[in-house]
Structures are given as C-alpha cells and as structure tokens.
Design a protein with these regions (language model features):
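FIC/Doc superfamily catalytic core
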Residues: 1-131, 135-247
C-alpha cells in the first residue's frame, strides 16, 4: 500500500529529526519543533469524511503542523468518553508545557525518565493536534531520553493495552478536567510513572543483552531474543535486513 510506505518513510524522517534535534542540548525545546515534527509525519493536509446519523455525509480537514480547530475526545476501552483540551485552551497549554519542560530540565530536580514520563502524560491530556498525537507523544519521549543519553524506547503493539491502562489509571487519579492533566505534577502520575519506569528498565536490559550477545545463532527482533540451531539462519536474516531486495 502506497500510503503505508509513505507513512513509514515520514516516521523514519521524524525519528531522524528527533535524533538530530536531541544532539543540540543547549537549545531549548520550542513549539515550532513540535509543529514541524507533526507536519513531517502527516506530510500534508487531508480531509476526513464522516457519516452522520441522518444519512448525511460531513467532512473536515486535518491540518498538518497546526493545532486543532475542533474538539477531540476518545472512547476509552471501558466505554466512557474522555475529553481532551479544547481548541481555545490548546495554544496556552502547549506554551505552558514547553516552558515547563525547559525550566524543569534546567532545574534538574526530575530525572530524565520522570521528565519524559510527565511530559508525555501532560501532552496526551492536551492532545493538541487533530491526528497523530500518539506518534508525536512517543517521538517526544524519545527526544527527551536521547537528549539525556538514555536509549530510545518502543511501545510495542502487543503491550499497548498495558500502556493504555497505565494512562487510564492516572486519568482516574487526576480526574476528567483537561487542564488538571495538562498541569499534572510528578506525584500525581504514579500509575503511568511506574509503567514508564518498567518500560525504560526493560529497554536498557535488552540493550545490554544485545550488545553483549556472543552467540552467532541468536537474532534479535522486535525486542525478542530468537535462538536458532545454526548461525546460517541469522546470517540470512541479517543479509535480508541490510539488503531488502534480497529474496
């Protein structure tokens, strides 16, 4: 599918942007960087068509690199509706989020893991864009971790329910008012922080195993260690990974 290939290409470009920006440790985070990252991921504006109950079709435009102009919400896995910040609130909340991050980073009271977790949670409660918020949130987490010389992390699809449950439990502690979540303190996000700490710890552990692996029969894929009976399989798989045209 052409669209899938385009999205993968845009995601790779976005990841490289994050890696390059993270090297500029003396430069403060800006809203412009977040918007540019969003524009890179979405590539262009596009229309979404929805069918209304009376049989009429409506549409609206998703704007790449621009904050939302329509309210957004989600139906949780428990069937309840959860509202994010309004379009009117969003510019102020995002300004405050970026200002808070830059100040907190300078103060150094929070560890890089705490800083990344709290930024992620606050950002998710704002949901500043009409689409792509999850991808931006995860890229920004890796921007913060990489900026502080931590390994990047991946929320794998098989573990997504655990991630959503950690967010949900934190939402229950803070309540449904978006601004309460957008200004959350580290002590208010304990369920998500516990999940995030474990996620980072597992990533570090896997990285150590990967770099110390001496067995030629072992191949690492999607965070999993796969052992083969002979090294020939791993040689073939590594060749296919580096040369995608091989069949």
């Amino acid at each position: 599918d052409v669209r899938d290939v385009q999205e993968m290409t845009a995601s790779n470009v976005g990841l490289r942007m994050v890696q390059e920006e993270a090297k500029l440790k003396q430069m403060p985070l800006t809203q412009n960087f977040i918007k540019t990252l969003h524009k890179t991921l979405l590539r262009e504006d596009y229309s979404v068509f929805v069918n209304l109950p009376n049989g009429v079709q409506s549409s609206y435009v998703i704007h790449a690199g621009q904050y939302k102009t329509r309210p957004n919400s989600v139906i949780t896995r428990y069937g309840t509706r959860f509202d994010y910040a309004s379009p009117e609130e969003t510019p102020i909340l995002m300004r405050d989020l970026v200002d808070w991050y830059n100040n907190a980073e300078q103060e150094g009271v929070l560890s890089p893991v705490e800083l990344a977790a709290l930024f992620h949670y606050r950002y998710i409660r704002i949901h500043p864009f009409e689409d792509g918020n999850g991808r931006i949130a995860r890229l920004m987490v890796n921007f913060i971790l990489s900026r502080h010389n931590y390994p990047m992390i991946v929320v794998r699809s098989r573990n997504k329910n655990e991630y959503l449950e950690a967010l949900h439990q934190t939402d229950l502690e803070l309540g449904p008012i978006p601004s309460d979540g957008a200004y959350a303190d580290i002590k208010n996000i304990r369920p998500f922080l516990k999940y995030f700490n474990n996620l980072v710890a597992n990533e570090v552990y896997n990285d150590v195993l990967f770099v110390s692996e001496k067995n030629e029969n072992v191949w690492w894929y999607d965070g999993e260690r796969i052992a083969f009976r002979t090294p020939n399989y791993t040689k073939i798989l590594n060749a296919m990974r580096t040369e995608p045209t091989l069949t």
